[in-house]
Amino acid sequence: MQARREQPPVRCVAARDLGGAIVFMLGQCSRYPRAVRSPTMARPVLIGTRPFMLNRLWLGFFLAAAVAALARWLLGGDPAVFAAIVESLFSMAKLSVDVMLLLFGTLTLWMGLLRIAERAGLVTALARALGPLFRRLMPEVPEGHPAIGLITLNFAANVLGLDNAATPVGLRAMRELQTLNPSSDTASNAQILFLVLNASSLTLLPVSIFMYRAQQGAADPTLVFLPILLATSASTLVGLLSVAFMQRLKLWDPVALAYLAAVALLLGGLIAFLTTLSAAALASASSLVGNLALFGVIIVFLLAGAIKRVPVYEAFIEGAKQGFDVARDLLPYLVAMLCAVGVLRASGALGYAIDGIRWVVKGVGLNTDFVAALPTALVKPFSGSAARAMLIETMQHYGVDSFPALTAATMQGSTETTFYVLAVYYGAVGIRRVRHTVGCALLADLAGIVASIAVCTWFFGTR
């Protein structure tokens, strides 16, 4: 077993669970607020702030809107564009607060339920169940290493669609993997696989997307459950295969094959069943399975807690308090991005970009109905908050149950903020050479986008 390298002491009490990690992430440490020490850096690495590229993206939204508005005024004779921009600023600021009201409840609920699952030992059991697979995919990580449990916890939060809860746990997992890294400034194979699987957005219960659809008045918020399940499975599979190819992983190992075959069998059976259904039946099946799975997970968490004699109410309140803190800290980011996207739409810049893409797609002979959903996919690799704002704006502009809005919601659930994840996770441990991480992660994102378009066309046609 490879020995773990000694690290400089962290000047904060390390969180030992999901809730504690989130409090740690949000800057509740007394000595270095909003910072974590990297084992390879003398100064704390700020992880509570967005990367520099997000500053450029946000500024670019306003500058593009200004150029488009000036063009409409000076060349098109439309001075009313500035009134539309100002009106959009205030309406989007109000919308941000409306969205946050439901987000407070959603995050508070699921953070409380996750705390019950932790204390009931479900996370530990999941780590044991996935241990044999991780030993084949990450052979350099010793059996029983703390990174395995943290990676499992990170994936559990991602599976539930709680990306804001997954990030702090993922940072702790990355730090544990760094203790096994023979080259402190170069990404190890295990770190690359972990990052790419994160960037592939493995989401089975996208509760945040259900919440946004509910807030926008969707008749059935869980309608996109099966499309997201299929699209995120495609992105994760492509991400895993691309890393396996680059790292020469032995996926034909009997144990790895058994896990992969089980997943493939389940997905294949699901797809085979879905092909027998009509379009109306597909939508109905997605609704039933989505609601049943969501409620089933809640019951499993509660029953597991009761069996393990966990005081479920007290555990729920303990986790729910931390969920409230997470939601509160998200409001400034939501206001910033929704207002920027609103200005971009009101100025006409977003419309020009969509029309240009539609012209190219039509020129190559493809159906253009999905083009209106592409802004969400295009900004998602750079910023989750920007993509979230694009999604909400698409719902408002086209209707929450329109084909563009359904496709955008599926894209949001099957892709990840690739560059943000790379910048934060690698920055926290001082990694500068990322090797094949970016290529594999972007390939997974592309697979998720293509699969989203194909699956939504299959499920919803061009409603």
Question: Which sequence ranges carry the predicted segments?
Answer:
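Membrane-embedded alpha-helical segments and adjacent helix-loop junctions characteristic
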Residues: A80-T179, A279, K308-H397
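Hydrophobic core segments of alpha-helical transmembrane domains in multi-pass membrane transport
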Residues: W58-R72, L107-R115, S200-T203, V207-M211, ...
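Membrane-core helix-loop-helix motifs of multi-pass transport proteins
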Residues: L177-L267, D401-Q412, T418-R463
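Alpha-helical transmembrane segments of multi-pass membrane proteins, especially transporters
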Residues: L57, F61, A83, A120, ...
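Transmembrane helix-loop junctions in multi-pass membrane proteins
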Residues: L70-I85, E118, L122, L204-D220, ...
